[in-house]
Amino acid sequence: MKAFNIKTEYLKNPLGIDIENPRVMWNCEGGVTQNAYQIVTDDWDSGKIESSSMRIVVPVKFEKGKRVTYRIKLWDENDTEGDFSEENFFE
């Protein structure tokens, strides 16, 4: 199971977003149902969050104008850990 079509504030790798706690959303491929996810940025790691939701409001305030790169990992309905997504960013 892997996250794809990853967006921040409905945009792919946006520049110039002016939001302290951005929304990140994704779709999943492989497996039947997402059971958990993890988001890892340069400075923050959500840890494994048990949820089928494919969106999160990142609860960390990031410095405006700084590029933040992140990856997402998913677990399926059998709690099988997937691979990290490709690296994404917002700035």
Briefly describe each language-model feature range.
Residues 28, 32-67, 73-85:
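Recognizes extended acidic, P/S/T-rich segments that occur
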